[in-house]
Curated annotation (Swiss-Prot):
A molecular-function term among this protein's GO annotations: 3'(2'),5'-bisphosphate nucleotidase activity
Family statement: Belongs to the inositol monophosphatase superfamily.
Subcellular locations according to the entry: Golgi apparatus; Golgi apparatus, trans-Golgi network membrane
Protein name, entry field: Golgi-resident adenosine 3',5'-bisphosphate 3'-phosphatase
Gene that encodes the chain: BPNT2
Activity control: Strongly inhibited by lithium.
Known EC number: 3.1.3.7
One GO biological process term: skeletal system development
Binding-site positions, Mg(2+) 2: D177, D180, D303
Pathway as given in its UniProt record: Sulfur metabolism
Top-level taxon of origin: Eukaryota
């Protein structure tokens, strides 16, 4: 007789055993899922490793959220800027030359470039391991570090861009300039210095960040998304103020005066990021104002991608001097010079400046 007078039939024993096996199965599968999540093998689709600081893209590529990429890009530019400022204020730059530019000037590099590059690159690479990242400075594998993002999107970004903007990770290329205007940085001309991040999708610039480390001003924008910066209310198209590189202002001045007249003003400045901000409504007293940005020589894509994205998001244009759109895939530089404008007839300006590219090759 069974205990307490209960008699179990063969069918009851079988049901009891099946229930027991079911309980054991669920307990064991839950244990395995927990173990897998610790190694990044579980989690939501497209979410990478579980946990608040895990990658924002799945291990097999998947998709990335451009809104998240913007948040990380802003943080990367600021973190890089902190390194740039710290090195400059220490007055120990460890300055050296990487070689010569096409114009024969020293292509300088400092500790500020290197340390900013490390912070910016690894913050973006840890958050988005599946995307292609191009940066001006060499990334040394021996310096590798994991810099985690807390997955928080700032309120100003959420206010402008309310919903996620997902794109295939394989379509994304990131361009980093860890210290724009290195020459001016070594001369302690701080207002020209910026750190920049750009995200291109299928070669088209879609989001840009330009950060000024010494005034702590940051401009960002996403094409068809939102921005924290805007165009000025008016521009002078007839006799514009033209911002150009300090190294070849004389080349541009001669042609500009012939094109727009003797009232045209040429503003020599350092740094492509600074020059783009000169076209916008920027609340920084050290920032000069211009109506056009012209560049006549070879330039690298990490110098201009962020500015291109910001101008495009605000309805402006950045093209070669012949009016061609710039693709941010393939090689890291462009040969055709540069013309940037906003709230102007850009193609009419292109037609007015037929000889500037030739001027840059003299």
């Amino acid at each position: 007789m069974a205990p307490m007078g209960i008699r179990l039939s063969p069918l009851g024993v079988a049901v009891f055993c099946l229930l027991g096996l079911g309980v054991l199965y669920h307990l064991y599968s839950g244990f395995l899922a927990g173990r897998f999540s610790l190694f990044g093998l579980g989690g939501e689709p497209g979410g990478g490793a579980a946990g608040p600081a895990g990658p924002a893209a799945s291990a097999d590529g998947g998709t990335v959220d451009l809104r998240e990429m913007l948040a990380v890009s802003v943080l990367a530019a600021v973190r890089g800027g902190e390194e740039v400022r710290r090195v400059r204020e220490s007055n120990v730059l460890h300055e050296k030359s990487k070689g010569k530019t096409r114009e024969g000037a020293d292509d300088k590099m400092t500790s500020g470039d290197v340390l900013s590059n490390r912070k910016m690159f690894y913050l973006l690479k840890t958050a988005f391991p599946s995307v292609q990242i191009n940066t001006e400075e060499h990334v040394d594998a021996s310096d590798q570090e994991v810099i985690l993002w807390d997955r928080k999107i700032p309120e100003d970004i959420l206010k402008e861009i309310a919903t996620p903007q997902e794109v295939p990770a394989e379509s994304v290329t990131v361009w980093i300039d860890p210290l724009d205007a290195t020459q001016e940085y070594t001369e302690d001309l701080r207002k020209y210095v910026t750190t920049m991040v750009c995200v291109a999708v299928n070669g088209k610039p879609v989001l840009g960040v330009i950060h000024k480390p010494f005034s702590e001003y940051t401009a960002w924008a996403m094409v068809d998304g939102g921005s924290n910066v805007k165009a000025r209310t008016s521009y002078n198209e007839k006799t514009p103020r033209i911002v150009v590189s300090r190294s070849h202002s004389g080349m541009v001045k001669q042609v500009a005066l012939q094109t727009f007249g003797n009232q045209t003003t040429i503003i020599p400045a350092g740094g492509a990021g600074y020059k783009v901000l000169a076209l916008l409504d920027v609340p920084d007293k050290s920032q000069e104002k211009a109506d056009l940005y012209i560049h006549v020589t070879y330039i690298k894509k990490w110098d201009i991608c962020a500015g291109n994205a910001i101008l495009k998001a605000l309805g402006g244009h950045m093209t070669t001097l012949s009016g061609e759109e710039i693709s941010y895939t393939g090689s890291d530089g462009i040969e055709g010079g540069l013309l940037a404008s906003i709230r102007m007839n850009h193609q009419a300006l292109v037609r007015k400046l037929p000889d500037l590219e030739k001027t840059g090759h003299k």
